[in-house]
């Protein structure tokens, strides 16, 4: 007998269970397992996956939602993911499939906008290959001259930031339009207003979290797991805990292409050396008169050190840096292994006993001779 099926999007993964937003049968997410044959072939299921689901009898018979917060889930209430459709994009950190864009959120102030941190986020976002939407929050706390300064500065970097204020909802409509009908990831440092922005973009987000997590965890808004939330005008949005402390997991030769202003310089021309890393090599196509060139050099050293950790270790000077009560740093000699280690009393007694025994043996041998 052919089982009834529907297609949908995986919106959350928790242990061995998957929440799927179905397209036709119900407007509520359905709790599912993964078919054994998918496990056997090593087919993983990720948030954002497009899947085909075998529907549970209870849903077909009663037409009810499967997300009521009950303490146990009966076998007949579970759907089963039977197929995972090919993915258009895949991210490992955070683990999300089929994402289309990353929305980076920063604050213009409180905390102050820090150019190195912003640059690092942008570089890692570029490495995903996804479209980037840059959003500056807290417009209501700065002067118009500050807004213009950062707008002009980011334009030179190759970006057109969306300026918003969650507090007075200024500029939010433009961001909503960018998110419409797409799977988007939201990332950024702490304290910039991401949670408040998500609450504004996704009305009832706390209830969505409660529904999705009612059977499996306590039902509070946490970003330890990636979850997709429905946007009112279409599309899905995820907060991304794995992206909020970005690593530069790129190849050295790839790094220059993650800076739009440098990428533009390489359009239609090449460096003389194929392995050029754009550090002043002869006939390099990339100039040095762009603002983030220093960022590029610093990030490049970090990437090179990751590839050759044995070469990046500094020679041991025998000193270690410590911070005093006055906040000043100072060097203190390291204690060499075993050289300055105090012997334990037990060890001293053992050595003394061994010495006495050896002395007695020597004396005994002398008496015998």
From Swiss-Prot:
Superkingdom of origin: Bacteria
Stored PROSITE patterns: ENGC_GTPASE, G_CP
Molecular functions (GO terms): GTP binding; GTPase activity; metal ion binding; rRNA binding
Subcellular location: Cytoplasm
Compositional bias ranges of the Acidic residues kind: 359-369
Record bears the keyword NADP: no
Residues reported in the UniProt entry to bind Zn(2+): 271, 276, 278, 284
Keyword Nucleotide-binding on entry: yes
EC number: 3.6.1.-
SUPFAM superfamilies linked to this entry: Nucleic acid-binding proteins, P-loop containing nucleoside triphosphate hydrolases
One GO term of the biological process aspect: ribosomal small subunit biogenesis
Cofactor-binding details, from the entry: Binds 1 zinc ion per subunit.
Family affiliation: Belongs to the TRAFAC class YlqF/YawG GTPase family. RsgA subfamily.
Database matches in HAMAP family: GTPase_RsgA
The protein, known as: Small ribosomal subunit biogenesis GTPase RsgA
Species for this entry: Synechocystis sp. (strain ATCC 27184 / PCC 6803 / Kazusa)
Record lineage: Bacteria, Bacillati, Cyanobacteriota, Cyanophyceae, Synechococcales
The gene coding this protein: rsgA
């Amino acid at each position: 007998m052919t089982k009834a099926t529907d297609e949908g999007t995986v919106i959350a993964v928790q242990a061995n269970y998957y929440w799927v937003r179905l397209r036709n049968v119900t407007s509520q997410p359905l709790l599912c397992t993964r078919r054994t044959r998918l496990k056997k072939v090593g087919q993983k299921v990720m948030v954002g996956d497009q899947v085909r689901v075998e529907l549970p009898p209870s849903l077909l018979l009663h037409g009810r939602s499967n997300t009521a917060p009950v303490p146990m889930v009966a076998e007949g209430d579970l759907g089963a993911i039977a197929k995972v459709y090919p993915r258009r994009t895949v991210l490992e950190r955070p683990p999300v499939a089929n994402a289309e864009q990353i929305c980076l959120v920063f604050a213009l102030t409180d905390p102050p906008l820090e150019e190195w941190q912003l640059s690092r986020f942008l570089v890692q976002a570029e490495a995903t290959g996804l479209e980037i939407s840059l959003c500056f929050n807290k417009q209501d706390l700065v002067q118009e001259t500050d807004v213009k300064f950062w707008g002009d500065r980011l334009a030179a970097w190759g970006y057109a930031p969306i300026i918003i204020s969650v507090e007075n909802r200024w500029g939010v409509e433009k961001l909503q339009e960018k998110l419409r009908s797409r799977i988007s990831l939201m990332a950024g440092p702490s304290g910039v207003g991401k949670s408040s922005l998500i609450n504004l973009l996704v009305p009832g987000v706390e209830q969505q979290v409660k529904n999705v997590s009612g059977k499996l965890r306590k039902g509070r808004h946490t970003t330890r797991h990636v979850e997709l939330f429905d946007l009112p005008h279409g599309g899905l949005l995820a907060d991304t805990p794995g992206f909020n402390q970005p690593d530069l997991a790129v190849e050295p030769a790839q790094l220059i292409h993650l800076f739009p202003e440098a990428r533009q310089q390489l359009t239609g021309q090449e460096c003389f050396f194929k392995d050029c890393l754009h550090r002043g090599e002869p006939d390099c196509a990339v100039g040095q008169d762009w603002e983030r060139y220093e960022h590029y050099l610093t990030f490049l050293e970090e990437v090179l050190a990751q590839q050759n950790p044995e070469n990046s270790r500094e020679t041991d000077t025998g000193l270690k840096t410590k911070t005093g009560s006055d906040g000043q740093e100072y060097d203190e000699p390291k204690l060499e292994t075993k050289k300055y280690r105090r012997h334990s009393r037990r060890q001293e007694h053992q050595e003394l006993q061994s010495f006495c025994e050896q002395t007695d043996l020597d004396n005994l041998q002398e008496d015998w001779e």
